[in-house]
Amino acid sequence: MKLAPFLIPFIATTVTASLAGEALSWAGQLVGGGRGALATGDGPVRTENSWSYVDCGLATDAIQLKSIKVHPDPPVPGKNLTVTVEGDVLETIEEGAYVDVTVKLGLIKLLQKEFDVCDEARHANASVQCPVQPGPYTVTETVELPQEIPKAKFSVLVRGYTVDDEDMVCLDLFVDFMKK
């Protein structure tokens, strides 16, 4: 599986939905030895028994997240995970927009990589492509989670920036595969 950001700040939502699923997949592969050897900064917007997310962005960010939903809830290793992201794009997202993604297992950094949002949307054949015009977006993506995801707590930190290096989106995703 290629390390394509599917949680990436939602090229206009498709890439965020995709990044959320892929981040879990990446973490499982990195730790499990697989082929690739998760509101405005005041707390979790959504909390389940095994996952939560924090919209750490500002009201002035180009992308405003409304919700992230997963099915099945909680995510199950070895099964498909469908992620639906809703949000508003406040300003046009142009070529050159990028996100920095960090995947951690506890305090251990497993992956830190920068992704070009528009390139990733093209490679993923996403329904939303650059330039992304302002407006509301809902995107659903399905990814296969690896069976070998270890029983551990993962965090996926996403920081997105416009072509002008202005804040675009900020998302922290936390997934706990220790719970049953």
From Swiss-Prot:
The keyword Signal applies. InterPro entries: GM2-AP_sf, Ig_E-set, ML_dom, ML_PG-PI_TP, NPC2-like. Residues 1-20 form the signal peptide. Monomer. Catalyzes the intermembrane transfer of phosphatidylglycerol and phosphatidylinositol. Belongs to the NPC2 family. This is Phosphatidylglycerol/phosphatidylinositol transfer protein. The gene is NPC2.
